[in-house]
From Swiss-Prot:
Entry binding sites for Mg(2+): 78, 152
Role noted for this protein: Catalyzes the ATP-dependent amination of UTP to CTP with either L-glutamine or ammonia as the source of nitrogen. Regulates intracellular CTP levels through interactions with the four ribonucleotide triphosphates.
The protein's name: CTP synthase
Organism, scientific name: Mycobacterium ulcerans (strain Agy99)
CDD domains in UniProt: CTPS_N, GATase1_CTP_Synthase
Source domain of life: Bacteria
Pfam families associated with the record: CTP_synth_N (PF06418), GATase (PF00117)
Miscellaneous note of the record: CTPSs have evolved a hybrid strategy for distinguishing between UTP and CTP. The overlapping regions of the product feedback inhibitory and substrate sites recognize a common feature in both compounds, the triphosphate moiety. To differentiate isosteric substrate and product pyrimidine rings, an additional pocket far from the expected kinase/ligase catalytic site, specifically recognizes the cytosine and ribose portions of the product inhibitor.
Amino acid sequence: MRRHPQTATKHLFVSGGVASSLGKGLTASSLGQLLTARGLRVTMQKLDPYLNVDPGTMNPFQHGEVFVTEDGAETDLDVGHYERFLDRDLSGSANVTTGQVYSTVIAKERRGEYLGDTVQVIPHITDEIKRRIMAMAEPNADGRRPDVVITEIGGTVGDIESQPFLEAARQVRHDLGRENVFFLHVSLVPYLAPSGELKTKPTQHSVAALRSIGITPDALILRCDRDVPEALKNKIALMCDVDIDGIISTPAAPSIYDIPKVLHREELDAFVVRRLNLPFRDVDWTEWDDLLRRVHEPKETVRIALVGKYVELSDAYLSVIEAIRAGGFKHRAKVEISWVGSDDCQTDGGVASALGDVHGVLIPGGFGIRGIEGKISAISYARSRGLPVFGLCLGLQCIVIEAARSVGLTEANSAEFEPGTPDPVISTMADQEHIVSGQADLGGTMRLGAYPAVLESGSIVAEAYQSTKVSERHRHRYEVNNAYRERIAESGLRFSGTSPDGHLVEFVEYPPEQHPFVVGTQAHPELKSRPTRPHPLFAAFVKAAIDYKEGELLPVEMPERVSNGAERRDQVGQSIPEPANRG
């Protein structure tokens, strides 16, 4: 009798059917959080069926944000959910794309590694997918293997692009044995208002499509706008050949942080550990219950304006939004996001209308010239009113440009936006010049991943971190031009953090006596924030917004400027009146 090899690591695959955007990533993340709270070591992976090697060159409006890991991989935004819910760092191997798989297989064929075989989807493509899935079960740096690998299969069952990944997952179950692999399928149960009915047929057809390729799900997540009655659960269990204990109803939750509670109430985690014969303890809710109290019982509310280029799609700033909210949780505050298109801030009237009733301004990262003057105008407006400002990556660069213009460098700009500017206060990094000039690939070639920085003792950022040595993740090609540091410093802007060799500017800020909180970082600290462990810079920013709301700070006297930084001499020294409503 054939015996499957013993494996210490179990594999759980999450697929989706009927429609996209059903929340597979959040479902997988929440289940991972539950298993972790039961004392299991969990890691996660996303299989993306698109042909791009990674999302680094994709339009944010199509894909959403690019999540950068510690080791510098540009990955899917779901990897950010995984890190936040598991509260652990993942590597680039947590995201696999069709582009990566085909690139590897074709490279092997060119090297002759297939010994003249005809290279095909099965077995060569599926074998490479399986290799990457199985690699997640390898021991970590401490020599410990994960107890469970949760792998989310992107796309929808029936999509031609997803078929090789589903086939590879089927083969993993065949290779490791059914007792070591669990399939969880997320499906839609629509409600038809005219007839007042919940319809199960789409789920039945989705499971039938899954079974046609050899996969029988062990459990079904039923997405619906209401609880699915027991009678319908029994019907779905019968028609889809799934144990009734594996039929999980998941109506819309009050927040994404409530999803683990929803799944636990339906006993999904208990069903999984029993089916996979995993050792476990009862769920430890101590940390998560404290988070939920902070989410649902805030003591105050602040409004933060996010001035960005891609505000029509909130997923383009997913980690930023989660980090701001987590910063609010730290202070038992609810953060309301005011979405402000940077194009709308290019005029005095536009910026006043957009920012007149907020308590803080966040300038996120981005690329290209569109909307840049609006971001700079937003910084000038906030500076003149003592309004807290936090700049990320491009946000730091805009703070520097605004500061340079305030000391007479009226044409100061970035080489990215205006290559011919006489004052390129933001310049191309030396090792990026050949890439920007088109002599090398754009994809995967930025300054990516974790880099250290040294902070000035006593600075706002050092006080926030409670340390003068930090490490943050990066994604950029441009840097502050060191030739302009002294001139920019005349504005009062301090270069409060640099790379260890002092060459790269990593953090800037105005001293508190000049402005309560204007801080910029070349990094992306939002990528390291966790709901249970808010990033210190976001916590400090939200605290500054709370202080602004409560403190009735007086406006700072500054000359009013036109968009290119030139002063209006007839109004120099006049303070700009405080907005009537801080609300």
